[in-house]
């Protein structure tokens, strides 16, 4: 095993021992979030780690029975101070079972950030940090301790809470003073007095992220990114992302809590029953589908001044109002990746272009004997990921006008248009029935024109009746051989096999959503012993690392 992996295992083993010993601390001290009053009330972003949940699900006592952790913890490379700390975590002076929270705060465009944790005994924490970190033991001044780590990074604490604070050189105040002010701020100026945070913290999660949209809007100003964010996040209200390690899945749930009852841009039900008939030319490696409420989407776009101006520019360019443009579309959209292959043989248009380039190359060489130019050395094959973007349409009135008059794509046949992508392959747009597909596969485009549908279907266990659905395969055996061969070629066989070994417990990713809530789930193979997904991921990773 190389040195880096050994260090990683020692650190991992140390964390597991601390986790096991922390169960004792858990019994000794009650749960509290009082230390989080250090976070400013109008922090832009707050991330909370529920340490107790993670310790319970990781099952550190069980992990420590694994040979890899027993070997790492008992190899004798541990300092006396760290060993003492692992034997008795309370010696640190900090309560490692309480929630840890990070925050980003913005005022007048200037950002500061910090990591907040619970302190039980400031004096013992000062002693432990000075021994473990090699710092000069700080003196207590006005009830506070401070250690400067870098010019704008410092560790500040009292007998109740601590913060690893990252200041900003644009603030005309020392880093220490900025950190000390957080420790002295009363609760009414802290995140604990923020009603949005209270609603966020009341939820059950292992790791949670909260974004206050009101503060983001006020501090970030107006730009293109904010326009897009506001379309889905709303300039008022707040958003959160909650991560939970369940038994057979890792759940990542995001919700936009919009103020004033703002509508979702998703419909209440899934796409038209026929929409997924043109999902992909083969069963997809991954896909995502959306059923959009175009009226709600347009209303939210027009609610933002900058986006409204952009829409007006589009209306002027197209010579018609947005309502007339959108009348041609039904709001159903899907994007699928189906393969990685050479697309030249299936594409007569591309084949003709490549043959012309080949002749030009030969003529060039015949004039300059022995001279070769990459400019004219057109490849014999073009291997690309094959994608299909399917947009549901009610008619071809506006789409046809846009393709012919504005984008000026070349018409190949009725309903089929092409354009060069600039990357060798062509891009095709085909319209038939309720489908308008955009793809780099001539075969897929021509199949839609001939039959009105494509062969690829979503996996049987995917619920496509909701307004948001998706699935992405993670198991190599479920992927086309051409795709895995490409990964081996790009990564190298050794790195590819290591990736497969590390990812062995993972099966696929599913996506679903309704209203203002979306759910991404990473699915693991079922466990015979019923253990939690976090334990299994940690145990598997440790065992694989031990084989290097």
Where are these regions (language model features)?
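Short, Lys/Arg-rich N-terminal segment immediately upstream of the first membrane anchor
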Residues: 1-5
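Structural boundary/hinge residues at secondary-structure and domain interfaces
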Residues: 6-7, 11, 18-149, 187-234, ...
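Short, structured motif recognition centered on aromatic/hydrophobic residues
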Residues: 46-47, 112-117, 162-165, 384-391, ...
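Solvent-exposed coil/turn segments that connect beta secondary-structure elements
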Residues: 52, 119-122, 160, 169-170, ...
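Short loop/beta submotifs within extracellular cysteine-rich repeat domains
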Residues: 55, 122-126, 172-174, 396-398, ...
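An internal, short helix-loop-strand segment that often contains or flanks glycine-aspartate motifs
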Residues: 65, 69-99, 132-247, 274, ...
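Long compositionally biased, domain-poor regions of proteins
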Residues: 324, 329-433, 439-440, 445-446
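C-terminal regions of mature proteins
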Residues: 505-539, 543-547
């Amino acid at each position: 095993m190389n040195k880096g992996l050994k260090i990683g295992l020692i650190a991992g083993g140390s964390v597991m021992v601390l986790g096991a010993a922390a169960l004792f601390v858990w019994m000794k001290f009650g749960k509290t979030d009082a230390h989080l009053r250090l976070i400013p009330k109008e922090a832009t972003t707050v991330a909370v780690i529920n340490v107790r949940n993670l310790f319970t699900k990781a099952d550190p006592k069980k992990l420590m029975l694994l040979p890899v952790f027993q070997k790492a913890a008992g190899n004798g490379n541990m300092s006396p101070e760290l060993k003492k700390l692992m034997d008795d975590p309370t010696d640190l002076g900090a309560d490692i079972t309480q929630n840890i929270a990070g925050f980003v705060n913005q005022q007048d465009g200037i950002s500061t950030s910090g990591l907040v944790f619970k302190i039980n005994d400031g004096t013992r924490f000062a002693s432990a940090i000075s021994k473990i970190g090699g710092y000069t033991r700080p003196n207590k001044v006005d009830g506070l301790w401070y250690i400067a780590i870098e010019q704008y990074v410092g560790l500040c604490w009292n007998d109740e809470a601590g913060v690893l604070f990252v200041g900003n050189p644009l603030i005309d105040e020392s880093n220490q003073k900025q950190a000390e002010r957080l420790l002295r701020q009363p609760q009414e100026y802290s995140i604990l007095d923020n009603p949005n945070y209270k609603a966020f913290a009341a939820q059950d999660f292992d790791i949670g992220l909260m974004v206050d949209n009101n503060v983001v809007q006020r501090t970030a100003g107006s730009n293109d990114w904010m326009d897009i964010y506001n379309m889905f996040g709303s300039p008022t209200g707040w958003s959160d992302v909650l991560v939970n390690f369940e038994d057979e899945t890792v759940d990542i749930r995001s919700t936009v809590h919009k103020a004033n009852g703002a509508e979702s841009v998703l419909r209440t039900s899934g796409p038209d029953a026929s929409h997924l008939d043109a999902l992909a030319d083969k069963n997809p490696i991954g896909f995502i589908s959306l059923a959009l409420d175009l009226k709600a989407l347009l209303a939210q776009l027009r609610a933002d001044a900058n986006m409204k101006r952009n829409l007006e520019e589009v209306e002027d360019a197209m010579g018609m109002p947005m309502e007339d443009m959108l009348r041609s579309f039904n709001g159903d959209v899907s994007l699928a990746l189906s393969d990685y292959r050479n697309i030249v043989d299936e594409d007569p248009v591309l084949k003709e272009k490549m043959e012309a380039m080949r002749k030009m190359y030969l003529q060039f060489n015949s004039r300059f004997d022995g001279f070769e130019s990459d400019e004219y050395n057109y490849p014999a094959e073009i291997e690309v990921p094959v994608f299909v973007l399917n947009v549901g349409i009610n008619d071809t009135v506006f789409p046809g006008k846009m393709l012919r008059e504005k984008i000026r794509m070349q018409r190949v046949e009725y309903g089929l248009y092409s354009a060069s992508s600039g990357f060798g392959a062509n891009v095709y747009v085909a319209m038939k029935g309720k489908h308008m597909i955009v793809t780099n596969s001539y075969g897929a485009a021509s199949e839609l024109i001939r039959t009105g549908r494509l062969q690829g279907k979503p996996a049987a266990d995917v619920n496509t009746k909701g307004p948001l659905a998706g699935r992405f395969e993670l198991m190599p055996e479920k992927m086309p051989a051409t795709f895995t061969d490409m990964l081996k070629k790009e990564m190298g066989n050794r790195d590819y096999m290591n990736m497969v070994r590390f990812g062995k417990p993972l099966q696929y990713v599913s996506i679903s959503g309704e209203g203002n809530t979306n759910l991404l789930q990473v699915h693991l193979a079922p466990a015979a012993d019923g253990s939690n997904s976090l334990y299994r991921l940690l145990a598997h990773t440790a065992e694989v690392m031990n084989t290097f």
